[in-house]
Amino acid sequence: MIDEDISKIAETLSKEEFKLNNDERIINALERIATSLEIIAHNKIHNTKLKNNANPISSNNVFNSINNDSQYIENFLMKKGVTIKFVPEINSEINDVLYSLASFMGNNYSKISSVYKAIKSRLSSGESVKIDMKNFTQEEISYSCQFCHNLYELTFLDYYKYLKSPKYQIILAPNRIPLVINFLTGHWLESYVVYEIKKLINYFNIKKEVSFLLNPQICLPNGDDFELDILFSVDDNIYWIESKTSDYHHYVEKYSKVAKILNSENLHPYLLLTEVPQQTCNKLTNLFGMKVLNIENFSEFLFRELEQYKTHIIPEEAYNVENNENE
């Protein structure tokens, strides 16, 4: 009898212990269910915005003040034995609104990178993600929330919620329309580069001939197909900029080989990376003979590079007014 009672007590205690061990998992599961239900209910309203605003085209396109005749660049490539197979039209979806978003991302990348990478990791599934920001600095929290707010306003996020102290969490779910996937998986970085170039061309009031050739699909002299990111010229100088938001290891050597094929005193090749410290970039530059830049230093570098072409600097007040009109 005593043995039987002990057995029952042990069984009861075991069940209680199992219950206690599973409390946290149950709570977490309930939180996930509640979040999912909130997202589903919220999307019924928010998806109406998506239909109306998925392709907001601004009348002040970033290229309006730039001569986009790329003949000089194309002639240079042909002289190097390169065949231009296809040049896509400028993407009308990447308008001033998205250029402004790309500029925000590029100029504040170190502050938003954790949230950006969390969003990017959910683009294939569209699932919600909870981001714990307890270890973020106040600046990182502020910029991350601003970033998510901007994405949400543009319907790039299906759902966004910020939980203040003591939780300090962001809960979000990305929108999976092609525009969003294309932009956030990497095209934002190209857009950032183009936007910064255009901004400085206006700032320095450059009167030299300026042109762009974006994403041309080419055939190299050895028959290999290749696609370049950004080519732009100022006067006789051509700048070639490749950009990578993730794994760069398989590309550096390829870019280096293409740079050797295109080698000229008028060609300036660069590789822009987001996840690599400048010290490592310097080592890659020395190893592959192609200037490698970290995103944190890109704006300053570009400023110094284009300053040599300045006619005169537009007064700061006029510059700010112009930017405000384009945003």
For the regions a protein language model found, what residue spans apply to each?
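Intrinsically disordered, low-complexity Ser/Thr/Pro/Gly-rich regulatory segments
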Residues: 30, 48-327
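Extended alpha-helical segments
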Residues: 1-52
